[in-house]
């Protein structure tokens, strides 16, 4: 090989190596690994696959620092964690009813009820923690840039069967759980965008990919979600008055931070009455 050929080969190898390095660091393949943009893309991909646990992990990595995605990731995290808490509560409530209906074998239903409530509590606590961080920001309007969730808002048939005390086969149970959780996430998103129990409206609102919601409306929606999530800790369920009070207090504080409306006034009255009732136990 001539000296010129050797130099040419060396330069070619250097160019290839440089290209590979650029490709692995981002380039045409997408955002560089470890950046907020990388985790934002990952959150979208895992959300589309209904891997909600991984989606939350990606969002938590984003919200760990202040960056261009933080505000959007935090509101998505609120919608997602509140929705999952709702989904697991629905599962727990259905199996609790099943334990009462199935007198010959209530133990299995009670175990499921307990396990679902443990999961509901985990996501409820993640929700209230994320909300505390959100309240430190003063974004107005609030950015909502998450994709419209897949799934259906229709009641899951298998839950009706479980509520009646019918034992679900494993082939029925796992798909039913996924549908219930997807439904919870869908309804959580509807609540966040101000389209409670109205998926078509929520889908239309989220179509732009960069919805801006007045802070008053979003905080009011979160107050509702906080109060709903707190029901997990009432005397009929987990029976933890301290945690119940935390959720109710957060909801009341949220309502105090926005201008009073007929909706906020009614919700404040409802929460206050609920707290007084709890104090009697």
Model-inferred region functions:
Residues 26-29:
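Bacterial signal peptide processing site
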Residues 35-61:
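Alpha-helical segment of the N-proximal tetratricopeptide repeat
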Residues 21-24:
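C-terminal motif of bacterial Sec signal peptides marking the signal peptidase cleavage site
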Residues 1-14:
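Bacterial N-terminal signal peptides that target proteins for export
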Residues 52, 110, 117, 179, ...:
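TPR-repeat structural position
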Residues 33-44, 74-101, 125, 129-235, ...:
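Amphipathic alpha-helical repeat scaffolds of TPR domains
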């Amino acid at each position: 090989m001539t000296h010129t050929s050797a130099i040419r080969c060396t330069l070619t190898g250097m160019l290839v190596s440089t290209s590979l390095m650029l490709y692995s660091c981002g380039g045409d393949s997408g955002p560089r690994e470890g950046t907020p943009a990388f985790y934002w893309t990952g959150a979208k991909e895992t959300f589309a696959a209904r891997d909600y646990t991984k989606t939350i992990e990606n969002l938590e990595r984003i919200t760990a620092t202040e960056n261009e995605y933080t505000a959007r990731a935090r509101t998505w995290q609120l919608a997602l964690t509140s929705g999952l808490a709702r989904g697991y509560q629905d599962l727990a409530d259905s199996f609790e009813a099943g334990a009462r209906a199935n007198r010959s074998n209530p133990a299995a239903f009670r175990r499921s009820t307990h396990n679902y409530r443990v999961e509901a509590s985990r996501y409820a606590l993640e929700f209230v923690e994320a909300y505390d961080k959100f309240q430190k920001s003063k974004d107005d309007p609030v950015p909502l840039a998450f994709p419209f969730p897949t799934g259906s808002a229709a009641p899951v048939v298998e839950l009706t069967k479980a509520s009646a005390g019918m034992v679900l086969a494993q082939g029925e149970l796992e798909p039913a759980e996924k549908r219930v959780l997807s439904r919870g996430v869908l309804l959580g998103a509807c609540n966040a965008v101000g389209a409670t129990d109205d998926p078509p409206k929520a889908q239309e609102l989220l179509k732009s990919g960069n919805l801006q919601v007045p802070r008053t409306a979003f905080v009011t929606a979160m107050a509702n979600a906080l109060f709903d999530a707190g029901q997990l800790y009432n005397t009929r369920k987990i029976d933890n008055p301290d945690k119940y009070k935390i959720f109710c207090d957060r909801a009341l504080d949220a309502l105090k931070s926005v201008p009073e409306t007929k909706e906020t006034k009614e919700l404040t009255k409802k929460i206050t009455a609920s707290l007084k009732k709890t104090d009697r136990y």
